[in-house]
Amino acid sequence: MQVGIDIIEISRIKRAYERYNRLFLKRILTESEIEWCLNKPRPFESVAVRFACKEAFAKAMGTGISGELSWQSIEILNDKEGKPTLFLKQPFNGLKSEQVKLSLSHTHEYAVAVVIIEPDK
C-alpha cells in the first residue's frame, strides 16, 4: 500500500488564477475538471482540492509530477452522488483507477487530499 497527502492554501490557487486566468487552469486541470469546477459556487476550493489530490497521488507513486505523470494525465471527476474518483488518462506503471482511493476535503482556507494506492489483487 502506498499513501500520499497534500494540503494547499486556497488563496494560492486564487492568486495564480488572478495572475494567469484560464491558462493556469489549463495547466493543472483537464477540460472536464475545469468545467466542473467553474460551475461550482466556490470554484477555487474545487480547483485547490484537485490540485492537492494530484500532488498527493504523485507523492504516493513516489514520482512527483513530471515525465510520464503530468497534470493532464490525472483526472478527478465526481460521480452522480458527488464521490470523487481519480482516473488515469494514460497507463502509468500498470496502475488501475480502481486501486486508487481518495479522501478530499476543504474549508474556506485550505484544501487537503489523501490518496491510498492498494496493491493489485
From Swiss-Prot:
UniProt-annotated location(s): Cytoplasm
Annotated Gene Ontology cellular component terms: cytoplasm
EC number(s) given by UniProt: 2.7.8.7
Gene Ontology terms describing biological process: fatty acid biosynthetic process
Binding site for Mg(2+): 6, 55
Family matches, as InterPro entries: 4-PPantetheinyl_Trfase_dom (IPR008278), 4-PPantetheinyl_Trfase_dom_sf (IPR037143), ACPS (IPR002582), Ppantetheine-prot_Trfase_dom (IPR004568)
One Pfam entry name: ACPS
Cofactor(s) recorded in Swiss-Prot or TrEMBL: Mg(2+)
Disulfide bond annotation, renumbered to this chain: none
Keyword Magnesium: yes
Keyword annotations from UniProtKB, A to Z: Cytoplasm, Fatty acid biosynthesis, Fatty acid metabolism, Lipid biosynthesis, Lipid metabolism, Magnesium, Metal-binding, Transferase
Keyword field contains Heme: no
Function, in words: Transfers the 4'-phosphopantetheine moiety from coenzyme A to a Ser of acyl-carrier-protein.
Family from the record: Belongs to the P-Pant transferase superfamily. AcpS family.
Protein name stated in the entry: Holo-[acyl-carrier-protein] synthase
Species assigned in the record: Chloroherpeton thalassium (strain ATCC 35110 / GB-78)
